[in-house]
């Protein structure tokens, strides 16, 4: 494909790499003529009898996993899904998630990887924006029954089919019978096709779908597995949501499977549950966000569980403080790997042979020798080592644009294809990065990205709200929490009523503001805009005074 960075491919409405870059990455051996389904089949051929996946109820060999994926692919094709279709995949961590992903990969059907925490507000938005043919869900997701939501999606025309892992009645369709089809051997997906859509936290309420193509995402996975030392002896625990880029492909679930290792599936990340799994399954690798890492450290200091098998803890999603980083090896008994990554592409790792200073005080260096990183000032000029600027990047696994968002792409990507991340970083002379903050109006709550505008728009739609603005407030556990400042109409609603309203709107629970303040007015900038900077500073001073 030869489209320019800001021009959608004629095939799939997503910007692709220019021809010169395609040739560069092919010649370098980064990209291969293979899709994810073919990669799993190759791994199964090497390790047919090894256990690929296990949970509390089931253990699947590679041969069994491949057969189940191919049967489901055949069943989904019979149900009406075909190459180029889009579905919204909304499943909890589980073997069914892996089987469904690879069945869709085989068909060339593109899943939008929704998170378990997403609810009707987000799911409906994804379905409509992506023109999804189907919603694929479960009978239970973290205590939530999504089936009434699925019926509403059908009734409103947001999608045409709703397929459920578990019990389902018409108009919903149960997925279990689809596994009875004869296994599908052929593979419709091409290496250059979109494999899936990851989700961007973004800074607005518009869904931003990140098109990840088979060949570049496979490179992301394989190169990550090499850097992180994943092999057939790896036992990887999934505490974080498997739909996340971090858990899925950095190297994560798929990296483990392509290396011939074993994935231990957990729907929970709390220390009590995960420590028991680590001891029972002899887990060697796992990944956490900083708030969970802190909980694990505190729990292990008081509990002293058997974590002797654990070799590597990856921590990413937000910056891990150096004091917490220093505790990982003595408390958990394993090596720490700091990770700076984004679903749009670029991922940085501290290396397994890095000296302690690098591991404790940086978020690593880029994965690929062909990652081109610039740290720039407000005028787009590169800054020197140790200076803070915006992180911009292009490379063999960083997208060239979001799906169906040409106007946004013109702002988010430079004319020569560099992605403007909005992250403020500094870089040392050896290319290691340190995260210093964000430029974009986005809140990072324990690794989950929240677009302030999305929450603001819902609040402003409330009949008793005149105006609303949402900002981050510092938090020692999550890094950031959310605070909404609301100018009410009379009679003024209570903070509790506004939170209940947001839940009723179908907003994911992690996006509902932790704190809501009713105020008569907002501070303004010199040109009459809301000064979020002043509001953040007010919160910071208030929290410091309480400490």
Curated annotation (Swiss-Prot):
It catalyses: salicylate + holo-[ACP] + ATP = salicyl-[ACP] + AMP + diphosphate. Its EC number is 6.2.1.61. GO terms for biological process: antibiotic biosynthetic process. Signal peptide: none annotated. Pathway: Siderophore biosynthesis; Antifungal biosynthesis. GO terms for molecular function: acid-thiol ligase activity. Keywords: Antibiotic biosynthesis, Ligase. InterPro entries: AMP-bd_C (IPR025110), AMP-bd_C_sf (IPR045851), AMP-binding_CS (IPR020845), AMP-dep_synth/lig_dom (IPR000873), ATP-dep_AMP-bd_enzyme (IPR050237). PANTHER family: LONG-CHAIN-FATTY-ACID--COA LIGASE, NONRIBOSOMAL PEPTIDE SYNTHASE PES1 (EUROFUNG)-RELATED. Involved in the biosynthesis of the siderophore pyochelin. Specifically adenylates salicylate and loads it onto the holo form of PchE via a thioester linkage to the phosphopanthetheine moiety. Is also involved in the synthesis of the antifungal antibiotic dihydroaeruginoic acid (Dha or hydroxyphenyl-thiazolinyl-carboxylate), a precursor of pyochelin. Belongs to the ATP-dependent AMP-binding enzyme family. This is Pyochelin synthase PchD. The gene is pchD.
């Amino acid at each position: 494909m030869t489209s320019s960075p800001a021009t959608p491919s004629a095939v799939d409405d997503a910007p692709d790499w220019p021809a010169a870059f395609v040739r560069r990455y092919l010649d370098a051996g980064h990209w291969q003529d293979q899709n994810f389904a073919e990669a799993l089949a190759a791994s199964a051929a090497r390790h047919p009898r090894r256990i690929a996946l296990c949970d509390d109820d089931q253990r699947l060999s590679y041969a069994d996993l491949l057969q189940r994926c191919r049967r489901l692919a055949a069943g989904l094709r019979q149900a009406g899904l075909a190459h180029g279709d889009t579905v919204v995949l909304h499943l909890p961590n589980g073997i069914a998630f892996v089987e469904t992903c690879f069945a869709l990969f085989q068909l060339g059907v593109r899943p939008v990887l929704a998170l378990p925490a997403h609810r009707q507000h987000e799911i409906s938005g994804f379905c409509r924006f992506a023109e999804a043919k189907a919603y694929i869900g479960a009978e239970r997701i973290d205590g939530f029954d999504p089936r009434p939501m699925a019926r509403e999606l059908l009734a409103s025309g947001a999608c045409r089919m709703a397929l459920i892992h578990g019990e389902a009645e018409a108009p919903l369709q149960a997925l279990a019978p689809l596994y009875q089809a004869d296994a599908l051997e052929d593979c419709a997906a091409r290496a250059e096709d979109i494999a899936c859509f990851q989700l961007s936290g973004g800074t607005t309420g518009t869904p931003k779908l990140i098109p990840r193509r088979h060949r570049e995402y496979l490179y992301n996975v394989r190169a990550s597995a090499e850097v992180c030392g994943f092999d057939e002896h790896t036992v990887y625990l999934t505490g974080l949501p498997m739909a996340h880029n971090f858990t899925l492909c950095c190297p994560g679930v798929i990296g483990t499977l392509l290396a011939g290792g074993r994935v231990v599936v957990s729907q929970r990340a709390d220390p009590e549950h995960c420590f028991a799994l680590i001891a029972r399954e002899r887990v060697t690798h796992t990944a956490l966000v900083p708030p969970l890492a802190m909980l694990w450290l505190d729990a292990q200091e008081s509990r002293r569980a058997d974590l002797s098998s654990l070799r590597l803890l990856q921590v990413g999603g937000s910056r891990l403080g150096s004091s917490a980083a220093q505790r990982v090896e003595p408390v958990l008994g394993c090596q720490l790997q700091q990770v700076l990554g984004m679903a749009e592409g670029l991922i940085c790792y501290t290396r397994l042979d890095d000296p302690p200073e690098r591991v404790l005080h940086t978020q690593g260096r880029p994965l690929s020798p062909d990652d081109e990183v610039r740290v720039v000032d407000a005028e787009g000029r590169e800054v020197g080592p140790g200076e803070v600027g915006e992180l911009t990047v292009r490379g063999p696994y960083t997208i060239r644009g979001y799906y169906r968002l040409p106007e946004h792409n013109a702002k988010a990507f430079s004319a020569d294809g560099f992605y403007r991340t909005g992250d403020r970083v500094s870089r040392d002379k050896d290319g290691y990065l340190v995260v210093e903050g964000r430029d974009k109006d986005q809140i990072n709550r324990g690794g989950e990205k929240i677009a302030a505008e999305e929450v603001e728009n819902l609040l402003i739609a409330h009949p008793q709200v005149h105006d609303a603005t949402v900002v981050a407030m510092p938090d020692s556990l999550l890094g950031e929490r959310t605070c909404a400042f609301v100018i009410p109409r009379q009679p003024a609603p209570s903070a509790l009523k506004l939170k209940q309203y947001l839940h009723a709107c179908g907003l994911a629970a992690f996006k509902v503001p932790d704190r809501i303040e009713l105020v008569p007015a907002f501070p303004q900038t010199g040109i009459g805009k809301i000064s979020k900077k002043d509001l953040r500073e007010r919160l910071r001073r208030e929290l410091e005074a309480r400490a």
